[in-house]
Amino acid sequence: MELLESALAKIQPVDEALLTEAQAKLDNKTKPPGSLGLLEEMARRFAAITGDLSPKMGKKVIFTFAGDHGIVEEGVSLFPKEVTPQMVLNFLRGGAGVNVLARHAGAEVRVVDVGVDYDFEPTEGLIIRKIAKGTRNFAKESAMTREEAVAAIEVGIALADRAKAEGISMVGTGEMGIGNTSPSSAIIAAFAGCSVREVTHRGTGIGDQALEHKIKVIQAGLDLNRPNPEDPLDVLSKVGGLEIAGIAGLVLGAAANRIPVVVDGFISTAGALIACEMHPNVREYIFAAHNSVEIGHQMMLQRIGAKPILDLQLRLGEGTGAALAMGLIEAGVKVLNEMATFEEAGVASS
């Protein structure tokens, strides 16, 4: 709990004056003011978050957190839980979607085992920080204890602290965990007070009958556990996931260390939402990578006040959207740093 409390105490609002100064710098580039649209918004936010009007773009890292889910026992996913460790091994071999898109973006992928029901051998690129071998079935009991939830959050915070020490310029979130759209739907339903049906979709591609079953299972879990929306740790521990907790910690740690954090899709945003509910200033450090096909994602983004960078009908997770968005954020930063001013170019300004 000490690491979590320390991180929360360090999170400060982003300096509004830096946002204004960064925009003034952009307005002096050889272009009409605001003509690069959202690229300029990304650039000024990146500068203000880092506290540097000429931010350096060094290493970019996507942390893909993996964990299993007891709720899979209820038949809410198209795939068995054995796919979770199989996909982790695919990540480590560099063969997954996130690996391909991260290579394209010039980002590194680090896989974090925070709760997979499998014993991995030590492998390059794999960070083993297992809190438990998956959550329990939240349709029958709490997904985890409060202590387990805090421990998983602190895994993410520690990784953000290490990223700061390494000089990493930008971090992204990703996840792998069969069944993890169910806890994500439960989390937003708990906070928003909406119906489960409004925030639950097909996940890995289940049919109509399976979707109806999934909605009933999630509702049963919420009715049983009665998570308190005023207590983010209560929501997380009762209906969440270990990888969702790890992501929440990474987002909190990034905010505490003034590192821009690119949040992927539905499951990653569930983690970011937990972080934002724990500290209101966290939202200022988040870049929402994209708008997911999962219907609950839009409600999450509205609640944290984040505008998605991309809308590509993505629903894979892993950090794929974060990898794509990182390239656009970096493009905005390059405009801020490399584009000539009117004076430098000998061009008359308005």
From Swiss-Prot:
It holds the Pfam family DBI_PRT. HAMAP family: CobT (MF_00230). Catalyzes the synthesis of alpha-ribazole-5'-phosphate from nicotinate mononucleotide (NAMN) and 5,6-dimethylbenzimidazole (DMB). This is Nicotinate-nucleotide--dimethylbenzimidazole phosphoribosyltransferase. The keyword Glycosyltransferase applies. Its EC number is 2.4.2.21. The active site is at residue 318. InterPro entries: Nict_dMeBzImd_PRibTrfase, Nict_dMeBzImd_PRibTrfase_bact, Nict_dMeBzImd_PRibTrfase_N, Nict_dMeBzImd_PRibTrfase_sf. Pathway: Nucleoside biosynthesis; alpha-ribazole biosynthesis; alpha-ribazole from 5,6-dimethylbenzimidazole: step 1/2. One of its GO terms (molecular function) is nicotinate-nucleotide-dimethylbenzimidazole phosphoribosyltransferase activity. Keywords: Cobalamin biosynthesis, Glycosyltransferase, Transferase. It catalyses: 5,6-dimethylbenzimidazole + nicotinate beta-D-ribonucleotide = alpha-ribazole 5'-phosphate + nicotinate + H(+). Gene3D superfamilies: 1.10.1610.10, 3.40.50.10210. GO terms for biological process: cobalamin biosynthetic process. Belongs to the CobT family.
